[in-house]
């Protein structure tokens, strides 16, 4: 009995794992997965800071929303060779659509469209105008997406809630600037105005430390005053943020994804250890 095998160009169109292996997309997939999990953990800690418990279905929805937003952005922005771009872009966009549909099935709230709308304007824009502007606009948009999504789940506009949203806005704003440092030289050569291209490393580091320290001090004071919970997590976040700002506002890239994108995973491990042993 004769055997028949598909040529690779056909196999790659129908076999998603093969696409990932052939074009080495596993780092990108793992990066999106870490960001999606971290997004849900941010919401988890937002609930914790307010002394509440995050419902399981909301946790799952947060993963889906974060995944869909990042997968859509990466799919639209994929600019490698035509075969690589076309194949993986389609897979990312299809998975983003599926995640979006599932999120609305689990959380039927029209306000859930807000992060998707912001994500679309960020990745695609309207009339050629996107929200990926320079001078910190991109950083503020990403941070605002996080901060505006949390009230949809928490339904809390109290002063304590606003402090929590401010905290996550600040954290996201600082972290996106940290990631812009990596591309500072290339952006400068291309004439793209990002905050790291406009400031010296010393001034940039001082600015990020100031933003982070001020926000953490406000939240820690609120926690010590009984307005918020989990003061130890906030102290840990303050120290951790100070560390990676000092390290990654320079040329170092070692373990950056783990320590920056994965910070809330690290805090979850600490929280679990505390619950079991302390």
What feature does the model see in each segment?
Residues 44-52, 98-107, 151-156, 217-225, ...:
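Hydrophobic alpha-helical transmembrane segments
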Residues 61-95, 172-216:
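Solvent-exposed interhelical
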Residues 84-157, 242-248:
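Intramembrane alpha-helical segments
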Residues 139-185, 213:
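Functional transmembrane core segments of multi-pass inner-membrane proteins
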Residues 44-72, 113-117, 158-178:
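Membrane-embedded alpha-helical segments that form the functional core of polytopic membrane enzymes
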Residues 80-94, 232-278:
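Extended hydrophobic alpha-helices typical of membrane-associated regions
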């Amino acid at each position: 009995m004769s055997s028949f095998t598909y040529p690779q160009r056909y196999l790659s169109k129908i076999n998603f794992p093969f696409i990932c292996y052939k074009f080495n997309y596993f780092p990108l997939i793992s990066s999106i997965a870490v960001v999606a999990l971290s997004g849900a953990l941010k919401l988890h800690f937002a609930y914790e800071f307010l002394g509440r418990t995050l419902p399981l279905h909301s946790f799952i929805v947060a993963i889906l929303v974060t995944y869909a937003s990042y997968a859509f952005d990466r799919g639209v922005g994929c600019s490698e060779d035509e075969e690589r771009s076309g194949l993986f872009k389609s897979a990312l966009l299809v998975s983003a659509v599926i995640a979006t549909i599932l999120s609305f099935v689990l959380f039927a709230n029209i306000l859930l469209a807000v992060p998707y709308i912001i994500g679309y304007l960020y990745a695609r824009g309207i009339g050629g105008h996107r929200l990926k502007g320079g001078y910190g606009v991109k950083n503020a948009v990403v941070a605002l997406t996080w901060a505006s999504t949390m009230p949809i789940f928490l339904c809390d506009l109290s002063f304590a809630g606003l402090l929590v949203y401010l905290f996550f806005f600040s954290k996201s704003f600082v972290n996106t600037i940290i990631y812009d440092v990596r591309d500072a030289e290339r952006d400068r050569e291309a004439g793209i105005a990002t905050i790291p291209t406009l400031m010296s490393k010393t001034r940039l580091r001082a600015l990020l430390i100031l933003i982070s320290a001020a926000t953490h001090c406000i939240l820690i004071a609120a926690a010590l005053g009984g307005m918020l919970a989990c003061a130890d997590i906030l102290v840990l976040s303050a120290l951790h943020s100070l560390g990676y700002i000092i390290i990654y506002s320079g040329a170092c890239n070692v373990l950056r994804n783990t320590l920056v994108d994965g910070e809330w995973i690290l805090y979850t491990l600490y929280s679990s250890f505390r619950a079991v042993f302390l």
